[in-house]
């Protein structure tokens, strides 16, 4: 992230870049950010993340008027800490399709398209969902092991695990906010994952994602 920021620079209006992308396994591949690059965020930064996520959801995923939600401990407008309450007011006044606060369970429903949180919460959520996903896969594997051949169980496990791995399926997560296109891949990425990352970068280039983000930040 530091290298990309120094070499490419930041877009005007962006305070700090953020890593984000779709949460695989959610009903509609909800885009959420930040997932770990900014552990503490000002309300204005969260608003910027909302604008960025909306651009990605609309132009890369093809969502129509993406719904944006603030990840919180409850859906009521008076819930949350000062950071979230202040951010809620900014989102309400913005041009985004803001649906209010959401809870983590909403990430696996068709309620929201873009989920916003700081990097502290986002990284914990990312790793928890990855862990619980593998735990469920292992549980299913042990349950069917008595009925299916071991090689078939292993094949089933691998296919499900690969589809749940955002780094493999999507090639990585975009680094939003820098003046260029950067995809952050996993350190253990295989050739297919790297190829998917290149394809994602090409899609971002083709739709002029960087310019769209510039416009979104100016008008949010």
Question: What feature does the model see in each segment?
Answer:
Residues 39-104, 113:
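Glycine-rich phosphate/diphosphate-binding loop of Rossmann-like nucleotide-binding domains
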Residues 37-47, 184-191:
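Short, glycine-rich nucleotide/cofactor-binding loops
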């Amino acid at each position: 992230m530091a290298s990309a920021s120094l070499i490419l620079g930041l877009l005007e209006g962006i305070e700090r870049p953020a890593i984000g992308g779709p949460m695989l396994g959610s009903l509609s591949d909800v885009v959420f950010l930040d997932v770990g690059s900014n552990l503490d965020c000002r309300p204005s930064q969260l608003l910027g993340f909302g604008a960025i996520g909306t651009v990605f959801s609309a132009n890369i995923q093809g969502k129509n008027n993406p719904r944006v939600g603030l990840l919180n401990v409850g859906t009521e407008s008076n819930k949350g800490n000062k950071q979230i309450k202040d951010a809620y007011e900014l989102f309400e006044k913005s041009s985004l399709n803001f649906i209010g606060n959401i809870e983590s369970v909403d990430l696996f429903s068709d309620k929201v398209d873009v989920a916003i949180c700081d990097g502290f919460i986002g990284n914990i959520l990312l790793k928890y969902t990855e862990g619980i996903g593998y735990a469920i896969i292992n549980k299913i594997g042990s349950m069917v092991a008595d009925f299916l051949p071991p090689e078939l169980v292993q094949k089933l496990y691998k296919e499900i695990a690969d589809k749940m791995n955002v780094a493999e399926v999507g090639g990585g997560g975009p680094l939003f906010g820098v003046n260029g296109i950067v995809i952050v891949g996993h350190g253990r990425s295989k050739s297919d994952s790297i190829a998917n990352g290149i394809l994602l970068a090409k899609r971002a280039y083709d739709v002029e994602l960087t310019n769209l983000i510039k416009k979104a930040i100016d008008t949010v």
